[in-house]
Amino acid sequence: MSEEKKVVLTREYIINLRRAYVVSRTKRAKYAVGLVRRFIARHLKVEPKAVKIGQRLNMAIWSRSIEKPPRKVHVVVEKYSDGVVKVELKE
């Protein structure tokens, strides 16, 4: 009946978030999350809606408040057979 999701592809990326520092201070962390989403969508050829940001990655981006997201994040990306892409912070 229901098909199990299988991992089709696994990759690691270091995503540079320095462009988030171009926008105003009160929008940087939210913009950085969007940068991650767009970067992964472009590299794995999926729609940005299909990219799911993991909780640990989200906490890492927001850890120093909205004004000071990290300059880079090291992530692990898994693409599933149904087209969904999950992004997690690398340990």
From Swiss-Prot:
GO MF term (any one): structural constituent of ribosome
Keywords tagged on the record: Ribonucleoprotein, Ribosomal protein
Entries under SUPFAM superfamilies matching the protein: Ribosomal protein L31e
Source species, domain of life: Archaea
Alphabetical GO biological process terms: cytoplasmic translation
UniProt feature coiled coil, ranges: none
GO cellular component, one term: cytosolic large ribosomal subunit
Organism: Pyrobaculum islandicum (strain DSM 4184 / JCM 9189 / GEO3)
Keyword Ribonucleoprotein set for record: yes
Lineage: Archaea, Thermoproteota, Thermoprotei, Thermoproteales, Thermoproteaceae
PANTHER family from the UniProt entry: 60S RIBOSOMAL PROTEIN L31 (PTHR10956:SF0)
Protein family per UniProt: Belongs to the eukaryotic ribosomal protein eL31 family.
The protein's name: Large ribosomal subunit protein eL31
